[in-house]
Design a protein with these regions (language model features):
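Active-site acidic/histidine proton-transfer and metal-coordination neighborhood
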Residues: 16-22, 56-59, 76-168, 178, ...
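Glycine-rich, proline-tolerant flexible connector loops at the mouths of alpha/beta enzymes
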Residues: 33-57, 106-114, 207
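Structural motif
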Residues: 27, 35, 96-97, 192
Length: 294
């Protein structure tokens, strides 16, 4: 029996941790990819803030699927030393939170450049981050993201061919669409490395983010295929369906919305319901809180 376990970036429902917990419980989601805590980036938490956040989550029975960090969202042409120190501090935060995985990226490319010119520096810097993470007992998970080295499928494959035995792969269909890549084609190339998915769908024509199954992310097809290859996998909802407080600091471009909601909470609920509709449509049923099996 294959199982999908649901997680979410609950800061899309609210910046307040207790309200994030409420949104997760309302939607039967048992895991969180923690990105923002009461208005503070998870990467900027003090020890005390991290301990307090963990206690609230533990008391509610919510576990971290991963630390949703911004590491690697850093210009490749800048000196790496400062960012490495920032990352090392993040490893400490991750351990306090009780997580053993960190979502990260492969560095922003200069506008108009040929990413191949920066490939060696990307690989070197990722290698240093892996050294630090391995020493701390934490696994790094690379996410494809518009504007970084690993924004398109072939460069994600490049990274995985070098580090795939140590580094996980997060597959984000909408981010591939926004980088001009068809998700199903990227999936075929990256399938053997995929650790888990970010559930975010989009329209190819304008990059607009839409609920799962409503765009061109091939999410039903991909989830059906993954369910035939493994035993279990985490699906992390990252709705981006309305402009919430945290998103303003994550993306420079203005998002186009084909679906609009009165509140972030309503958008979060809609995203959860859309994923559950997709899972139901490919034969899955909820067998316990936050777990869907087939």
């Amino acid at each position: 029996m294959f199982k999908y376990q649901l997680s979410a970036f609950a800061d899309e429902a609210s910046q307040v941790v207790l309200e994030q917990i409420a949104a997760l419980k309302k939607n039967n989601v048992s895991l969180i990819e923690l990105r923002g805590v009461d208005g503070t980036s998870v990467a900027r938490l003090t020890d005390e803030q991290a301990k307090e956040a963990r206690k609230k989550l533990d008391d509610a029975g919510i576990k971290l699927s991963s630390m949703g960090s911004p590491y690697g969202k850093y210009a490749i042409e800048k000196d790496f030393g400062e960012h490495r120190d920032f990352f090392r501090r993040g490893l400490e935060i991750c351990k306090i939170l009780g997580a053993d995985q960190i979502r990260m990226f492969s560095f922003f490319m200069p506008e108009g450049c040929n990413p191949a010119d920066w490939r060696n520096k990307v690989i070197d810097q990722l290698g240093l981050m892996l050294e630090d993470a391995t020493a701390a007992g934490i696994k790094l998970l690379h996410e494809n993201e518009k504007g970084i080295y690993g924004d398109i499928d072939d460069r994600c494959v490049d990274i995985m061919q070098v580090y795939g035995d140590k580094m996980g792969c997060i597959f984000d269909p909408a981010n591939f669409i926004q980088s001009g890549v068809k998700p199903i084609e990227a999936f075929r190339k990256l399938e053997k490395w995929i650790t888990y998915m970010h559930i975010k769908d989009a329209i190819m024509a304008d990059g607009a983010v839409v609920p799962a199954g409503k765009g061109e992310g091939d999410i039903p097809t991909i989830l059906d295929a993954l369910g035939k290859k493994a035993d279990k996998m985490i699906l992390t909802l990252e709705p981006h369906l309305t402009v919430f407080d945290g998103l303003k600091g994550l993306q420079d471009e203005e998002l186009t919305h084909h679906y609009t909601y009165e509140t972030p909470e309503a958008a979060f609920d809609a995203a959860c319901n859309a994923l559950k509709e997709v899972l139901t449509g490919i034969g899955y049923a909820e067998t316990e809180t936050g777990v869907w099996a087939k």
